[in-house]
Amino acid sequence: MKRTTMSQPEAATLFIAASEHDSNLYYATRFMAPDPFIYLEIKGERLMVMSDLEMDRARTQASVDRVLSYSEIEQKAKKQGIKDPTAVDIVHVVLKESKIRRLSVPANFPVIHAARLQERGYSLKPKRDPFYEQRVMKTADEVRHIEDAQRATEEAVAAAHALLRRAEIKDEQLWLDGEVVTSERIKKFVNVKLMERDCIAQHTIVAGGEQACDPHNEGSGPLPAHRSIIFDVFPRSATSRYFADMSRTVIRGKVSQE
């Protein structure tokens, strides 16, 4: 006798996050926001719940089916007897009509929201990155965005290397235009070059000598001659939000046989 299996109840996808910091949310909405907002996928429909401040921009820029007003849903929640509605109360009001009680959430979903949803009877299933598996396979446009960021990085690093070539060697240190060449000076140069190409760099590494042997030491102080100088540059495009990554080891002076 063939055994029949019960199908799982339908689940909705839920994010409560800021897309500026959450790549999965930005991927889903193509909307950049510095403050957390609610994003739901309910029975194939993609929804955002936005503050009045962001409503018009979201409706113009976001790649979703509908943008709902947070304040309007908040008023609806108050009429239902909720004195001070939280983000979870807003989610509950939106989900009420769909009768969905199961939620798929990202692994970094805030614990406070998860606890409040569970108190309301929702079942949550966290999903590891990448939340959207299709992110692994890049489209032609995504490849182009990554290439653009990488080219900008290569140009900035090449320009920094040109500075080191111009530097003079005095007392085992590098000098340029009458000043000692420091890690800070070269990092600033690289970061400014990247900004000129609409890329934002953080924690750029230009580390020389013993600092170059210390993983993720960003480097500080004078850069040495005749010793390794590590470059590790990984900016993000301010326009496309895609990253580049480039590492190089250079020496200004004589290379040790060791």
Identify the meaning behind each predicted range.
Residues 2-258:
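Active-site neighborhoods and metal-handling regions in enzymes and metal-associated proteins
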